[in-house]
Amino acid sequence: MRVLVIPDIHLKTWIFDRAEKILKDGKADRAACLMDIPDDWNMEFQIEQYKETFDQAITFAVDYPDTLWCYGNHDVSYPWGRLETGYSPYAERMVISKFEELENSLKSPTQIDIMHRIDNVLFSHGGLTADFLKWLDEDLLDAEIDDVIAAVNDASHDFLWNDESPLWFRPQYETREIFRPDTYKQVVGHTPVEKIFEKESIISTDVFSTYGDGRQIGESAMIVIDSETGKYEKIEVMGKWECDSDERTDIAIFRFN
C-alpha cells in the first residue's frame, strides 16, 4: 500500500491542500498524519488560525476516512495540561473541543493514537526505541508487534511525556537502540530537518516547520512510502513561502530505497 505521510502541521492549513492534491492525483492510497496541529511562533493570540487549521484537519478526515493520525507533543499538551513551547492559553478550550470533534469524525477511535502500523511501517511523532520499551516493560522487546503498539498507546501520560518516548524522541540527534530496525521502517516528524532523510531505518519528514521569522526550515516535499517494502518516493510540493497566491501543487518524484 502507498501511504502519504503528512508531517507536522503547526497551524499551516495549506499542508492539507497539498496532501489532498497528491491523493487526488492517485500518487497514494491513503494518508498518515504526524499531527502537531496547534502552535507556532508568535501565534498564541491567533485564535482564528487555530480554528481554521482544525477545521481543515476535520474536513480532511471526513474526505479521506482511512487516514491515520499520530498525536504529537503539541497536541496532547492541551488535554493533558502540560505546558509546551507556543502553547496558547487563549486557544486552549477551543483546541480541546476541536480535538474531540476530530476524534468523533473518524470511522474508528483507533485511527488516532500515539503509534500506528501499516504492514511493515511504523508511524509516530518521534520514533520508537528499544530503550523506551525496556523502561516501559522489558517483556515488550520480544512481544508481538501489535501488542507492542497497544502497550505504547496505553502507556501513562508520565511515561509518554518523556524525551525517550515516541512523542518526544529525536533520532536525528540521539543515539539509541532503535526498535527492530531490520524488520520495520519508521516514519517520524517532530524535529525540523532541512531534507527528508533516513537514519537507522527511521525516516525524518518535518520539513515544513519554520524559523521564528516565518521562513521554512526544510525542503518543500512529502513522502509516499510503500508499506510492505519500506521504499519511498519524495514528492515535491509548492511551499507556502514559495508562492502564497498559487494553490497548485507542482509534483516531481524521486525514488529512495
Where on the chain are the PLM-derived regions?
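Short, solvent-exposed aromatic-acidic interface loops
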Residues: 234-246
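Beta-strand-turn-beta hairpins that frame and shape the catalytic cleft
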Residues: 1-4, 116-123, 199-201
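Core catalytic region of metal-dependent phosphoesterases/phosphodiesterases
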Residues: 6, 11-102
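Active-site-proximal loop/helix segment associated with metal-binding centers of metalloenzymes
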Residues: 90-101, 112-181
